[in-house]
């Protein structure tokens, strides 16, 4: 039987990295699929650790945060959501357009984690969520979408994912769905054996959809995140935490180990979890003639804190490393 070598992947190869940070190559959209206990959280921790030196800010949307508190102390409470809404993506989009224009590619990066809250497939039909998949690389965003089970993404959205981490799946039905949604680059008859071989001892399979190659094994890698009992270090620049803690009363972390990032951060533009989210009549997103709350609805006035009516705040935070 022919043996096919599966190479180990390096998180440092994922954009942004030291090679791409000064360029317009743009961001990466990653999907992580694994059941509880598979090693999914350890992988997410490793992803955060690998990018903390070049990404100054993060927004987390986690449907399980109230139960497990995984991101507590990793990202400020101000920027942790417990429920997904397309309006969060809309505000991230507007913030990133302004941040990239004001600060350039190097200083405008944002990490967005959407963890265990994508069970409603209809959410992916919203125009802003689709824009994140289609054009998110131009927003300078690293997107990590983690879920326990395969999501029913439409084919055009699946084709927009840059990379997929797959943990071991023993259920044949779910394994077949995983293959159909994300892993069809591997010959179908080989897929069960490849998954069984690669995904042992908390390893996972990584499929790189950005590779232009005729050989499937050039796009398939294995990865095992290093396990550590220590808490995840705070993610983001000091001023990012300082701003958030000043609004919530959360205690500032004692240690920051990220590389110093210079320049302005449009912190006021980040969507804050403490603010009320826009709902659209119980729908998953706005209709063609619904842009958000009317002037008669509750919300911040022009003089109050938050986004102004045109979605642009004049607040800038610049003292990054006091």
From Swiss-Prot:
InterPro entries: A32L, P-loop_NTPase. Residues 277-322 are annotated as: Disordered. Residues 287-305 have a biased composition (Acidic residues). It comes from the Viruses. Pfam families: Pox_A32. This is Uncharacterized protein 015R. It comes from Frog virus 3 (isolate Goorha) (FV-3).
């Amino acid at each position: 039987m022919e043996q096919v070598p599966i190479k180990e992947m390096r998180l440092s190869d994922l954009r942004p990295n030291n090679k791409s940070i000064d360029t317009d190559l743009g961001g990466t959209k990653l999907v992580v699929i694994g059941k509880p206990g598979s090693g999914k959280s350890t992988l997410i921790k490793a992803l955060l650790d690998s990018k903390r030196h070049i990404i100054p800010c993060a927004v987390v949307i986690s449907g399980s945060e109230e139960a497990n508190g995984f991101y507590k102390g990793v990202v400020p409470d101000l920027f942790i959501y417990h429920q997904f809404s397309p309006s969060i993506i809309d505000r991230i989009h507007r913030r990133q357009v302004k941040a990239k224009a004001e600060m350039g590619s190097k200083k405008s990066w944002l990490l967005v984690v959407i963890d265990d809250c994508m069970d409603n497939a209809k959410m992916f039909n919203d125009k802003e969520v689709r824009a994140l998949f289609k054009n998110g690389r131009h927003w300078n965003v690293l997107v990590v979408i983690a879920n326990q089970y395969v999501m029913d993404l439409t084919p055009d959205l699946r084709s927009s994912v840059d990379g997929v981490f797959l943990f071991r799946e023993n259920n044949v039905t779910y394994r077949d769905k995983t293959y159909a949604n994300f892993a069809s680059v591997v010959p179908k008859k080989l897929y069960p054996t490849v998954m069984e071989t690669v995904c042992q001892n908390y390893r996972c399979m990584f499929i790189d959809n950005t590779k232009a190659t005729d050989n499937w094994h050039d796009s398939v890698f294995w990865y095992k995140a290093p396990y550590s009992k220590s808490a995840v270090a705070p993610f983001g620049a000091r001023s990012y935490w300082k701003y958030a803690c000043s609004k919530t009363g959360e205690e500032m972390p004692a240690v920051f180990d990220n590389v110093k990032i210079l320049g302005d951060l449009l912190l006021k533009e980040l969507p804050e979890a403490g603010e009320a989210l826009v709902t659209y009549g119980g729908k998953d997103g706005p209709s063609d003639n619904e842009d958000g709350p009317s002037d008669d609805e509750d919300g911040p006035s022009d003089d109050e804190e938050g986004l102004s009516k045109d979605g642009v705040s004049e607040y800038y935070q610049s003292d990054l490393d006091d």
